[in-house]
């Protein structure tokens, strides 16, 4: 007996009941994005490895530890399963001249991302993100729009206990001044740094401020703050974002240790967090990345965006009672005999042609067993075709969930009869015809 194969650890199957919930959630998200004028874009799952090294940063956990990378056996090209979407989206915009040729772009995407992490609750090796990118917008208004968009989605989903944290990372020269001061400070406390801190001291010291190590909290709490190195322009930008948020009635907390894990961010950064998902409490994060387009070889363009983890957001939504009811078919078609089976195919297609959902029974069985499956499907109506109906070119229409007996109608009158049963409660006798 051969060994049973299973999915890769940390990469999960999404089975039909759960997948229907995902689709319902995705419909809500698509409507929300379109209401703000964002348009879909789809990028490959596999990209050149240098794209992520250049965009995310060589000295980041993602690039150093978490990417699924391999060498193409055909041409030796180094490729990577995408660990995030922003770099791919910006690459596509540059390659196809979207911003330079067509002006500022509001774009969104959703799909799987891949990181080689230790699987745990809320953290997977294949996970799904919804990403939003605004390319070619320089002002604080787009930063605020992104945050306000999220607040509206939480309201649409009925989510509670999701709070906003914001910070400003300033401009490159301001971060450089702060970086020098931070390194000088941390050198005085080098003996207290853990292994990650020692490794990042000279390569990415800002990330030390984001440590979860409780022993390092006194050190990072007393560290120089980036806010003290911001120039007038960066301060004005951040102040304007806060003013928009206050006007929108969105509460927030300034978190001076919020730095994000990707090197391309500047100025505004934000996270929406919750305490209801355990340690993995971030459900959405983003900010401004004005230098990334030029960094990836395009004409310099300002940009901002955010991404949300679908698995975490779904868990929060379901915890808040957001899971939809299962969508049952309108009709289940049962049949007995060769002639009845042929007519059943015609009946099912006729109903689908009028906008009804219909499941055609396959696999044989008695009328009793087929009717049991019809009832179990949740369908509102069974269309019944036996030898007598088939000989007469007629079908039986039997309500399964409401009052009324079975009626026989011609194939031409089937859709009208089904509509009459389905919509009788609303007084719509011609529904679907």
UniProtKB/Swiss-Prot annotation:
Keywords: Aminoacyl-tRNA synthetase, ATP-binding, Cytoplasm, Ligase, Nucleotide-binding, Protein biosynthesis. Its main location: cytoplasm. It is found in: Cytoplasm. Its EC number is 6.1.1.21. One of its GO terms (cellular component) is cytoplasm. It catalyses: tRNA(His) + L-histidine + ATP = L-histidyl-tRNA(His) + AMP + diphosphate + H(+). GO terms for molecular function: ATP binding; histidine-tRNA ligase activity. It holds the Pfam family HGTP_anticodon. PROSITE patterns: AA_TRNA_LIGASE_II (PS50862). InterPro entries: aa-tRNA-synth_II (IPR006195), aa-tRNA-synth_II/BPL/LPL (IPR045864), Anticodon-bd (IPR004154), Anticodon-bd_dom_sf (IPR036621), His-tRNA-ligase (IPR015807), HisRS-like_core (IPR041715), HisRS/HisZ (IPR004516), HisRS_anticodon (IPR033656). GO terms for biological process: histidyl-tRNA aminoacylation. HAMAP family: His_tRNA_synth (MF_00127). Belongs to the class-II aminoacyl-tRNA synthetase family. Homodimer. NCBIfam families: hisS. This is Histidine--tRNA ligase. It comes from Azoarcus sp. (strain BH72).
């Amino acid at each position: 007996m051969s060994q049973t194969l299973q999915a890769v650890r940390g990469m999960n199957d999404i089975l039909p009941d759960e997948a229907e919930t995902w689709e319902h959630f995705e419909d809500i998200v698509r409507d929300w994005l379109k209401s703000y004028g964002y348009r879909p874009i789809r990028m490959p799952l596999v990209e050149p490895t240098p794209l992520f090294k250049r965009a995310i940063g060589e000295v980041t956990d993602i690039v150093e530890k978490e990417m699924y990378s391999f060498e193409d056996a055909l041409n030796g090209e180094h490729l990577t399963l995408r660990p995030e979407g922003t770099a791919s989206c910006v690459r596509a915009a540059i390659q196809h001249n979207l911003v330079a040729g067509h002006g500022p772009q509001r774009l969104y995407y959703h799909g799987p991302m891949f990181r080689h992490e230790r699987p745990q609750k809320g953290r997977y090796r294949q996970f799904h993100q919804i990403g939003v990118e605004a390319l070619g917008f320089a002002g604080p208004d787009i930063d605020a729009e992104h945050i306000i968009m999220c607040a509206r989605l939480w309201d649409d989903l009925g989510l509670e206990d999701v709070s906003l944290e914001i910070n400003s990372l300033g401009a490159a020269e301001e971060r450089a001044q702060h970086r020098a001061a931070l390194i000088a400070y941390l050198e005085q406390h080098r003996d207290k740094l853990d292994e990650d801190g020692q490794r990042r001291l000279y390569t990415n010291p800002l990330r030390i401020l984001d440590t979860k190590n409780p022993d390092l909290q006194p050190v990072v709490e007393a560290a120089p703050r980036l806010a003290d190195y911001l120039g007038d322009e960066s301060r004005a930008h951040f102040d304007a974002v806060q003013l928009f948020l206050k006007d929108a009635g969105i509460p927030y907390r300034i978190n001076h240790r919020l730095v994000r894990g990707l090197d391309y961010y500047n100025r505004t950064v934000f996270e929406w967090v919750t305490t209801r998902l355990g340690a993995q409490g971030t459900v959405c994060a983003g900010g401004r990345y004005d230098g990334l387009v030029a960094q990836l070889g395009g004409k310099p363009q300002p940009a901002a965006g955010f991404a949300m983890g679908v698995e975490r957001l779904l868990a929060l939504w379901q915890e808040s009672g957001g899971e939809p009811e299962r969508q049952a078919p309108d009709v289940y078609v049962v049949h007995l005999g060769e002639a009845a089976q042929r007519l059943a195919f015609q009946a099912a297609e006729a109903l689908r042609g009028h906008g009804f959902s219909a499941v055609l029974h396959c696999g044989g069985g008695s009328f009793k067993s087929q009717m049991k499956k019809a009832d179990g499907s949740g369908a509102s109506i069974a269309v019944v075709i036996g030898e007598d109906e088939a000989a007469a070119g007629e079908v039986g229409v039997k309500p399964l969930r409401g009052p009324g007996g079975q009626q026989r109608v011609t194939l031409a009158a089937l859709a009208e009869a089904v509509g009459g049963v389905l919509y009788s409660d609303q007084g719509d006798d011609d529904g679907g015809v």
